[in-house]
């Protein structure tokens, strides 16, 4: 083999070695986009439209505990796209949620939001996490569910209605309560790690914690205390009166109908402004 031939072969191998990481990254990106195109079936918009409202600016008495902006969630870390603990919703859904809250205030209760608009990148973050073996939060969030079943049982999906801006996760708090007098024990040991903390904060007992990947989270589940059943019924009734439809596998999950953006999935990050 001549010297020139050896040099050409060497340069070819060097070029291949330099370009390999880019090729792999391109394939991974194409695969991710393939998942988006296949499962979303709608437009993905990277910017926040002016028609999205910051809910707590419409009514500051709506409480907020945006878990995905912290490590207090089933992944155990802040989720991609959640740069601030802020609740955004498309305008019709935001205004309707305020109406729900105001109706509840007259009954001695108020809304607390756990998740509102969710960037598409956050859903992708959930998907990537679900495909790993990491399960540090299993005891708290899915003690009776194998992680490999999270897709099949509908707890995690490759796209989310939250990204369309009209779906919200909520609970209720009591307007008048004495934190020092808050007591009691959970009626079961499944997804109850925040029981004492939530009662001390005035949150109502719904029989399972938010984001509990378990059959106990089914809205009409029978194996609940009467108090938890009544609280779920109160929440569903109040939300339904203003156009929110409950997802029957999760007592906290509601979608405003008709959706303002039924075929659009947004991906702008959640920031203070």
Task: Give the location of each predicted region.
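Conserved metal-phosphate-binding beta-hairpin within the catalytic cores
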Residues: 254
């Amino acid at each position: 083999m001549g010297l020139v031939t050896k040099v050409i072969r060497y340069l070819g191998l060097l070029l291949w070695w330099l370009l390999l990481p880019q090729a792999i990254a391109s394939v991974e990106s194409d695969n991710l986009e393939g998942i988006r195109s296949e499962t979303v079936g709608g437009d993905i918009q990277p910017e926040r439209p002016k028609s999205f409202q910051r809910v707590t600016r419409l009514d500051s008495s709506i409480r907020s505990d945006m878990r995905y902006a912290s490590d207090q969630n089933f992944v155990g870390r802040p989720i991609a796209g959640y740069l601030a603990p802020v609740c955004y919703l498309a305008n019709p859904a935001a205004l309707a949620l305020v109406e729900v809250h105001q109706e509840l205030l007259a009954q001695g209760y108020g809304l607390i939001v756990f998740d509102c608009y969710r960037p598409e990148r956050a859903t992708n973050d959930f998907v990537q996490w679900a495909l790993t073996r990491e399960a540090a939060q299993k005891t708290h969030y899915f003690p009776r569910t194998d992680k490999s079943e999270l897709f099949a049982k509908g707890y995690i999906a490759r796209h989310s209605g939250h990204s369309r801006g009209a779906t919200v996760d909520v609970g209720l708090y009591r307007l008048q309560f004495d934190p020092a007098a808050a007591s009691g024990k959970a009626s079961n040991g499944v997804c109850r790690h925040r029981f004492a903390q939530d009662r001390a904060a005035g949150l109502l007992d719904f029989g399972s914690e938010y984001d509990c990947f378990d059959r106990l989270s089914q809205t009409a589940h029978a194996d609940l205390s009467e108090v938890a059943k009544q609280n779920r019924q109160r929440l569903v009734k109040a939300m339904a009166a203003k156009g929110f439809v409950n997802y029957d596998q999760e007592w906290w999950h509601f979608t405003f109908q008709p959706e303002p953006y039924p075929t659009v999935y947004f991906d702008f990050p959640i920031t203070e402004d």
